[in-house]
Regions:
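Sec/Tat signal peptide C-region and signal peptidase I cleavage site
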Residues: 18-22
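Glycine-rich, highly charged phosphate/nucleotide-binding loops
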Residues: 93-127
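Solvent-exposed loop/turn segments at secondary-structure junctions
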Residues: 37-40, 70-73, 140-144, 162, ...
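Bacterial N-terminal signal peptides
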Residues: 4-15
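Extracellular ligand-binding/catalytic regions of CAZymes and related secreted enzymes
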Residues: 23-29, 35, 43-46, 50-59, ...
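A glycine-rich, often tryptophan-bearing local segment used as a flexible ligand/cofactor-contacting loop or short
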Residues: 128, 137, 141-211
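Catalytic beta-strand/loop cores that center a nucleophilic Ser/Cys/Thr
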Residues: 99, 119-120, 131, 184, ...
C-alpha cells in the first residue's frame, strides 16, 4: 500500500518535552488523512496538511498517511458567458462547443476516476484499515468512492477514531448512516469566511474546548446543519452565539462536538475553512486535544447534552425573534435564561415548536416568533 500512487506517508517523530524513556510514552498513532474531494475543494487543504504533520511530530501523538487527490486530472470545461453583442447564431456555436468539450472531458476523465476508485478500494480494504488507529476527513466533500461505507462505519465502531474537519460534514450527503456517525450534514453557510462570528463554549473545563475563552470571536466560515442532526447523540462543546452574530437565524448552530460511536470515538469541528485558522495556536491546541481524545489518550465527558443544545436553540430563536420584532433582545434573553436555570427541561419541551420555524420563510415567521416570545414572557 505504501507504494500507491497517491497515498503519501509522513512519519511523525517523538515530541519535544516527552519523557526521555520511549517505553514511558505510547507509540504514535497511525492516522489515515483523507483530503480527496468530489465536490467543492477548499484551498486551505494545502495549508492544513503540513500543519497536521507538524502537530503529529511536535506532540508525538500521531503520524499521517495521506490519501490525496491523484495527479493528472484534466480541468473541467467552463460554461461560456454570453456577451451582450453575441448573435443567436454565434451563441448556439459556443453552446455546442461547450457540450462537445463536456463530452470529451467525461471520456478523458474515466481513467482518472477508475484510478481513484481503485486506490480507495485498496486503502479502505479491511486488510489496510487494520493498520490504522483512526481516520481524519480533512475537508472532504461529495461522495467519496469508499467501496463499503457500512464496513468503514463498523470499523470506526470497533474502537477506532474518526476526526472530521470543516467540510467533512459535507460528505456522503445521501447517507443517513454517515450523517448519524459524524453528527450532522452541511446545509449552507450563512456565516461567511470573511466575517468575524461569535461563539460560546458550553464546557470551559472540557479539554477539547478549554483553550477557547468562554465567549470569543473568530473569523472563519461556519456551517449550519440539516434536520438529521440528533442532539441525543452528541455532546456539543462550542456553538455559534446567535445573539452576537449576523445574520441571526432561528436555530442552533453547533460548531464542535464529540460523541461515542460504538467502541469508537468521533470528534468533529467546523473550524478550518480559512488558511489563517490552521496557523492559529488556539485552533492547533483544539485539534491536538480532539485527536488525542478520539484516540483514547485521555477520557473526557462524551455523554450527549441535548438539554444544553435545546437551551442554545431557544436562545438562537429568541435572538432572531427579537431582531425581527424590534423587541429588547437582552431582556428576552435574560427571561429565557432564568427559566432555563429553573427548569432545564423547559427548553427541551419547546423543541418541536422551534423546529417548525425552520421550515418557514422569513416573511412567514411573525406568528411563530410571537408564540415564542409569549412562552418566554409567561410568568
Amino acid at each position: 500500500m505504501r507504494g500507491a500512487w497517491f497515498l503519501v506517508v509522513a512519519i511523525g517523530v517523538a515530541a519535544v518535552g516527552r519523557p526521555a524513556s520511549a517505553a514511558e510514552a505510547p507509540r504514535p498513532a497511525r492516522l489515515l488523512v483523507v483530503s480527496v474531494t468530489t465536490g467543492f475543494r477548499h484551498a486551505s487543504i494545502g495549508t492544513a496538511e503540513p500543519v497536521l504533520e507538524e502537530l503529529g511530530r511536535s506532540t508525538g501523538l500521531f503520524h499521517c498517511d495521506h490519501l490525496r487527490m491523484p495527479p493528472g486530472r484534466l480541468p473541467q470545461p467552463k460554461p461560456p458567458k454570453r456577451a451582450k453583442d453575441t448573435s443567436a447564431e454565434e451563441w448556439a456555436k459556443q453552446e455546442a462547443e461547450f457540450k462537445r468539450a463536456q463530452e470529451q472531458f467525461r471520456r478523458d476523465d474515466q481513467a482518472w476516476q477508475a484510478g481513484l476508485k481503485a486506490e480507495f478500494a485498496k486503502v479502505f480494504s479491511a486488510e489496510s484499515l487494520r493498520d490504522f488507529d483512526g481516520v481524519i476527513f480533512l475537508s472532504t466533500t461529495g461522495d467519496l468512492p469508499v467501496p463499503d461505507l457500512a464496513a468503514f462505519l463498523d470499523w470506526i465502531k470497533s474502537g477506532k477514531a474518526f476526526i472530521g474537519f470543516h467540510a467533512a460534514t459535507d460528505t456522503f450527503k445521501s447517507s443517513d448512516a454517515y450523517c448519524d456517525m459524524i453528527g450532522g450534514h452541511f446545509a449552507g453557510h450563512p456565516w461567511g469566511a470573511g466575517g468575524e462570528h461569535a461563539f460560546v463554549v458550553h464546557e470551559p473545563g472540557h479539554r477539547v474546548a478549554a483553550m477557547f475563552p468562554e465567549r470569543f470571536r473568530w473569523k472563519d466560515e461556519i456551517y449550519q446543519y440539516d434536520l438529521r442532526t440528533k442532539p441525543e447523540n452528541l455532546r456539543v462543546l462550542v456553538s455559534l452565539d446567535m445573539q452576537a452574530s449576523q445574520p441571526k437565524e432561528p436555530w442552533h448552530v453547533p460548531v464542535a462536538w464529540v460523541r461515542d460511536y460504538g467502541k469508537g470515538r468521533v470528534f468533529s469541528t467546523n473550524f478550518g475553512h480559512n488558511d489563517t485558522t490552521w496557523k492559529e495556536p488556539m485552533f492547533q491546541k483544539h485539534m491536538a486535544e480532539g485527536i488525542a481524545w478520539a484516540l483514547g489518550r485521555f477520557d473526557a465527558p462524551a455523554a450527549p447534552n441535548p438539554e444544553v443544545q435545546a437551551a442554545e436553540y431557544l436562545r438562537s430563536v429568541v435572538a432572531a425573534a427579537a431582531a425581527a420584532t424590534k423587541a429588547d433582545a437582552d431582556a428576552l434573553r435574560a427571561k429565557a435564561d432564568a427559566k432555563i436555570a429553573k427548569d432545564a427541561a423547559w427548553a427541551t419541551g419547546l423543541r418541536p415548536m422551534l423546529l417548525g420555524i425552520r421550515g418557514l420563510k422569513p416573511e412567514d415567521r411573525a406568528a411563530a416568533y410571537a408564540e415564542v416570545i409569549a412562552e418566554v414572557e409567561k410568568p
